[in-house]
Curated annotation (Swiss-Prot):
It is found in: Secreted. The lineage of its organism: Eukaryota, Metazoa, Chordata, Craniata, Vertebrata. Keywords: Secreted, Signal. Expressed in the periphery of the cement gland as well as in the region of the hatching gland. Residues 76-86, 134-145 have a biased composition (Basic residues). It comes from Xenopus laevis (African clawed frog). Residues 46-59, 95-104, 181-198 have a biased composition (Basic and acidic residues). Residues 1-18 form the signal peptide. This is Protein XA-1. Residues 17-198 are annotated as: Disordered. Residues 29-44 have a biased composition (Pro residues). GO terms for cellular component: extracellular region.
């Protein structure tokens, strides 16, 4: 914007000469510039260390920024404020050289957390979710053909008859090895009448 105003001021000096004079008689001779559309500024050289592309009239007079020193950060930000990668603001203050908590640790006698914690007190840690493998937990998996049903599986105490409970025999399953003969005689066999006993 400043270049635009400066260009207009220079052009106004060139055009303000009287009609009869060509400008050669004036103490500073400037050739009339060709008409430039809507007053565009001259092309700017991006080489800041060699401003030879700028005519003296277009210089602003402002000094160039000083060369960078090793302690000076680039782009005006301190190096400690620069973050590399994705930074998510968490609201947690960053640790500095000072430790704000535990200011007087030497006077405190530390007790273990178990001694300070009342019974039934839970820690603030979230419990880890139990992820069953393939729908069932590893210790629930059976080796071999296991059909998951809602009925609890029978253990050895039901089959050895030590607790007094006995199960009716399954069809096609021999019960003589598991039960004694006296209990087998009391039960009627399949296909026999209830009134007849052996």
């Amino acid at each position: 914007m400043f270049f635009y105003v400066l260009l207009l001021a220079l052009m106004a000096q060139g055009w303000s000469l009287p009609q009869g004079k060509t400008g050669e008689d004036s103490p500073v001779f400037r050739p009339p510039s060709p008409p430039m559309g809507p007053s565009l500024p001259p092309p700017v050289s991006h080489d800041l260390h060699r401003p030879s592309g700028h005519p003296e009239e277009f210089r602003t007079g402002a000094s160039l920024p000083p060369k960078e020193t090793p302690n000076e950060p680039r782009h005006g930000r301190p190096k400690r404020d620069l973050h590399h990668g994705k930074v998510v603001p968490t609201g947690v203050p960053h640790h500095t050289g000072e430790v704000l908590h535990h200011t007087d640790c030497s006077s405190n006698t530390h007790k273990s957390h178990e001694e300070n914690r009342p019974k039934g007190f839970r820690t603030g840690r979230p419990l880890l979710p139990i992820k069953p493998e393939h729908g069932r937990h590893r210790r629930d998996l059976h080796h071999g053909k296991a059909v998951p049903t809602g009925v609890p599986h029978h253990t050895e105490k039901f089959h050895n008859g030590s607790n007094g409970k006995s199960h009716p025999p399954r069809p096609g399953h021999s019960t003589s090895a598991h039960n004694d003969n006296s209990s087998e005689e009391k039960r009627p066999k399949h296909g026999q009448e209830q009134g007849k006993k052996h």
